[in-house]
């Protein structure tokens, strides 16, 4: 049995810089890993039981589950294949812009790469991961990164240690709906990591205005956090966050928050790093 932590992320900013011929959007962003985790337990089955089961999450269609799809992709490379039960203890809210599903898929690839003796390196695992989602590779490499392309072109960066307050509004945001809006900014000027470092407060999220206008719960959460610092949207939402500063009374802010809240710390590397260095 192997039990591991599968971390979340926030986007410190997110700009859409263009649209490709295949319909995918080009973006620039910074992925920051945080210490909010799902816990995943991998338990091998007996030789007679070669199937895969997943418990702990509600999933009507297993074929659409990212954990199952990650395992199916890696199964082709297995030298010591065995059936598995994968149990997940969810702490990362789903559909919130925190990358929980992508992180779970990456964790599955990393753990099963060793358990099944697949022998793939990180670049090979990331190439599989991007088939599941553009932000899966960040969790494969387990480092904070400046992201470009559709999110898969990564330049690893050193970021200062921070603490954040995250609010999870009680709504589910449709990414498809946001992308379909004509008012979505799709031509932000390309920028650099150095420019971000000089004035991070100038860098926002192109989805924020739409999320605030279409979802009153997001507007309420952002107005609340804006009283104490600069509120930002992560991903396409619904979660919003602000950086903790010395003058903040964190416990009071959390106590009076209009929705579920989390206090998290930034990570410099994933807790799965031992699965990465051993490959």
UniProtKB/Swiss-Prot annotation:
Pfam family, one: GHMP_kinases_C
Binding-site residues for ATP, renumbered to this chain: 93-103
Known catalytic reactions: 4-CDP-2-C-methyl-D-erythritol + ATP = 4-CDP-2-C-methyl-D-erythritol 2-phosphate + ADP + H(+)
UniProt pathway annotation: Isoprenoid biosynthesis; isopentenyl diphosphate biosynthesis via DXP pathway; isopentenyl diphosphate from 1-deoxy-D-xylulose 5-phosphate: step 3/6
Active site, renumbered: 9, 135
Alphabetical UniProt keywords: ATP-binding, Isoprene biosynthesis, Kinase, Nucleotide-binding, Transferase
Superkingdom of the source species: Bacteria
Gene Ontology biological process: isopentenyl diphosphate biosynthetic process, methylerythritol 4-phosphate pathway; terpenoid biosynthetic process
Entry EC number(s): 2.7.1.148
Top-rank EC class of the record's enzyme: transferase
GO molecular function: 4-(cytidine 5'-diphospho)-2-C-methyl-D-erythritol kinase activity; ATP binding
SUPFAM superfamilies tied to this protein: GHMP Kinase, C-terminal domain, Ribosomal protein S5 domain 2-like
Record Gene3D superfamilies: 3.30.230.10, GHMP kinase, C-terminal domain (3.30.70.890)
Keyword ATP-binding: yes
Cited function: Catalyzes the phosphorylation of the position 2 hydroxy group of 4-diphosphocytidyl-2C-methyl-D-erythritol.
PANTHER family, per database record: 4-DIPHOSPHOCYTIDYL-2-C-METHYL-D-ERYTHRITOL KINASE, CHLOROPLASTIC
Family label: Belongs to the GHMP kinase family. IspE subfamily.
NCBIfam families from the UniProt entry: ispE (TIGR00154)
Protein's name according to its UniProt entry: 4-diphosphocytidyl-2-C-methyl-D-erythritol kinase
Record organism: Acinetobacter baylyi (strain ATCC 33305 / BD413 / ADP1)
């Amino acid at each position: 049995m192997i039990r591991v932590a599968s971390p979340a992320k926030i986007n410190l900013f997110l700009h859409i810089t263009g649209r490709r011929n295949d319909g995918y959007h080009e973006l620039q962003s910074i992925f920051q890993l945080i210490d909010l985790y799902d816990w995943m337990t991998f338990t091998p089955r007996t030789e007679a039981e070669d199937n895969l089961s997943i418990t702990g999450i509600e999933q009507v269609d297993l074929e659409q589950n990212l954990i199952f799809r990650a395992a199916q992709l890696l199964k082709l490379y297995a030298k010591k294949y065995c059936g598995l039960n994968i149990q997940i203890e969810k702490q990362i809210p789903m559909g919130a812009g925190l990358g929980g599903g992508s992180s779970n898929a990456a964790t599955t690839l990393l753990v099963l790469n060793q358990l099944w003796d697949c022998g793939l390196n990180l670049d090979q695992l990331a190439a599989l991961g991007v088939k599941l989602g553009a932000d899966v590779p960040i969790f494969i490499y387990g480092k904070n990164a400046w992201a470009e392309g559709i999110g898969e072109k990564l330049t690893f960066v050193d970021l200062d240690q921070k603490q954040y307050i995250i609010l999870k509004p009680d709504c589910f945001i449709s990414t498809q709906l946001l992308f379909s809006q004509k008012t979505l900014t799709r031509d932000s000027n390309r920028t650099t990591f150095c420019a971000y470092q000089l004035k991070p407060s100038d860098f926002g999220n192109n989805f924020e205005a739409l999320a605030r206008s279409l979802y009153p719960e997001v507007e309420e959460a952002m107005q609340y956090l804006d009283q104490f610092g600069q509120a930002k949207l992560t991903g396409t939402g619904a979660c919003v966050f602000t950086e903790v500063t010395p003058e903040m009374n964190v416990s009071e802010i959390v106590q009076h928050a209009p929705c579920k809240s989390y206090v998290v710390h930034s990570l410099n590397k994933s807790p799965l790093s031992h699965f990465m260095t051993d490959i």
